[in-house]
Curated annotation (Swiss-Prot):
<dbReference type="GO" id="GO:0050518">
    <property type="term" value="F:2-C-methyl-D-erythritol 4-phosphate cytidylyltransferase activity"/>
</dbReference>
<keyword id="KW-0548">Nucleotidyltransferase</keyword>
<feature type="binding site">
    <location>
        <begin position="237"/>
        <end position="239"/>
    </location>
    <ligand>
        <name>4-CDP-2-C-methyl-D-erythritol 2-phosphate</name>
    </ligand>
</feature>
<dbReference type="Pfam" id="PF01128">
    <property type="entry name" value="IspD"/>
</dbReference>
<dbReference type="InterPro" id="IPR003526">
    <property type="entry name" value="MECDP_synthase"/>
</dbReference>
<keyword id="KW-0511">Multifunctional enzyme</keyword>
<dbReference type="GO" id="GO:0046872">
    <property type="term" value="F:metal ion binding"/>
</dbReference>
<protein>
    <recommendedName>
        <fullName>Bifunctional enzyme IspD/IspF</fullName>
        <ecNumber>2.7.7.60</ecNumber>
        <ecNumber>4.6.1.12</ecNumber>
    </recommendedName>
</protein>
<feature type="site" description="Transition state stabilizer">
    <location>
        <position position="263"/>
    </location>
</feature>
<keyword id="KW-0414">Isoprene biosynthesis</keyword>
<comment type="pathway">
    <text>Isoprenoid biosynthesis; isopentenyl diphosphate biosynthesis via DXP pathway; isopentenyl diphosphate from 1-deoxy-D-xylulose 5-phosphate: step 2/6.</text>
</comment>
<feature type="binding site">
    <location>
        <position position="371"/>
    </location>
    <ligand>
        <name>4-CDP-2-C-methyl-D-erythritol 2-phosphate</name>
    </ligand>
</feature>
<dbReference type="InterPro" id="IPR020555">
    <property type="entry name" value="MECDP_synthase_CS"/>
</dbReference>
<feature type="site" description="Positions MEP for the nucleophilic attack">
    <location>
        <position position="159"/>
    </location>
</feature>
<feature type="site" description="Transition state stabilizer">
    <location>
        <position position="24"/>
    </location>
</feature>
<feature type="binding site">
    <location>
        <position position="239"/>
    </location>
    <ligand>
        <name>a divalent metal cation</name>
    </ligand>
</feature>
<dbReference type="InterPro" id="IPR018294">
    <property type="entry name" value="ISPD_synthase_CS"/>
</dbReference>
Length: 386
């Protein structure tokens, strides 16, 4: 995602509203912390804002859920947490006041329950702020509309002037902060545009996106997950153990009397994982992209191969949902290094370590790995669209 358009001095911050209990999804955990597509729902929208170059990002969370929020957003810089209030409006006001010392020119206010956030919507909103105090994304109403009284149909309502309102909503920061402070609470504010309108600010309408669908019920999580198309690839590799070489496994240097022999650094685990990722998107194998006959790859770090495979996955329109690597050897012991291996693979691929599994097994002293002549590895990678 490209950085958001801005003029010199026109800094852009964001508020993410995650202060509700969100229990209508049917579970014991607020929906913003529910794992969806491999990550907490909250993390999806915060990462989208971060990728757009927006900072700082203030997240309003429910009291008592600090640890869950910290874990959900681990590794994301420029994020601040604040406890939300009894209403959405109170939560937004508290978050806006956290930004007062930064004095951003503009601010986006977004619901954590809308995990898919296209960068194009952000761009349209901020462009609209050149002419108006606020801007909101909307979509047309396509169904017929009627008023009702209980189970009885009333008058028909013309849909031509009706819109479905989404978030994020964009505002000049000083104006929306003042509007929230002036809000008297005589009625619950449905969104921040209502607060701004009450303060006599003009709000622009920009084109929204169906991807910004709000997650409210458990069925919403299921329906959005069904739109994801998974693909799976497998990889396998083996290298001989020799004297005088360093041993690299999953990007981690392992102290051992021998190392693996190969054209690159012979990281057998990464090689298997690269093939699994390439297989998932039907992009050939590691030899197609990094032929051993090419001298430029002699002694090369296998990190480069894995990073390239990850880039190809993204360029093909997919994202990594899970990778699982099994290292097959009698020695060295893999257990003490598993955590470092997971973190290293996650860092290279730019994904959460929760999506990375590293295991080890032996062949009960059978075959070349059992005799200590080599190390093998197999990997499975799942990628999903959307």
């Amino acid at each position: 995602m490209n950085s958001v358009p801005s003029l010199p001095g026109q800094s852009v911050a964001a508020v993410v509203v995650a202060g509700g209990k969100g229990l209508r999804t049917g579970g014991p955990v607020p929906k913003q912390f529910v794992i969806w597509r491999g990550k907490p729902l909250l993390r999806h929208c915060v990462e989208a804002l971060e990728a757009a170059g927006i900072a700082p990002i203030v997240v309003a969370i429910p009291a008592g859920w600090d640890e869950a929020a910290t874990q959900a957003l681990a590794g994301i810089s420029m994020v601040r947490l604040v406890h939300g209030g009894a209403t959405r409006q109170e939560s937004v006001k508290a978050a806006l006041e956290v930004l007062e010392g930064d004095a951003p020119a503009r601010v986006l206010i977004h619901d954590a329950a809308r995990p898919d956030l296209p960068g194009s919507v952000i761009e349209r909103l901020l462009t609209a702020l050149d002419k108006r105090t606020g801007a909101i994304p909307v979509l047309p109403v396509v169904d017929s509309m009627v008023r009702g009284s209980g189970d009885a149909m009333g008058e028909t309502v013309a849909r031509e002037d009706l819109y479905r309102v989404q978030t994020p909503q964009a505002f000049h920061y000083p104006a929306i902060l003042a509007a929230h402070r002036a809000w008297q609470g005589e009625a619950l504010a449905g969104d921040d545009a209502q607060v701004a309108m009450r303060a006599a600010h003009e709000i622009a309408l920009v084109e929204g996106d169906e991807a910004l669908r709000k997650v409210t019920f458990a069925s919403d999580l299921e329906e959005q997950s069904m739109s994801v198309i998974p693909r799976t690839g497998m990889g396998f590799d083996v290298h001989r153990l020799v004297e005088g070489e360093e041993l690299w496994l999953c990007g981690v240097n392992i102290p051992h009397g021998k190392g693996l022999s190969g054209h690159s650094d012979a990281d057998v685990a990464i090689h298997a994982l690269v093939d699994a990722l390439l297989g998932a998107i039907a992009a050939g194998d590691i030899g197609d992209h990094f032929p051993p006959s090419d001298p430029q790859w002699k002694g090369a770090s296998s990190d480069r191969f894995l990073a390239h495979a990850g880039t190809l996955v993204t360029e093909a329109g997919y994202r990594i949902a899970n990778v699982d690597v099994t290292i097959i050897c009698e020695a060295p012991k893999i257990g003490p290094h598993k955590a470092a291996m997971r973190e290293t693979l996650a860092r290279i691929l730019g994904i959460d370590s929760a999506l990375v599994s590293v295991k080890a097994t032996t062949t009960e002293r059978l075959g070349l790995t059992g005799r200590g002549e080599g190390i093998a590895a197999q990997a499975v990678a799942t990628v999903v669209s959307g």
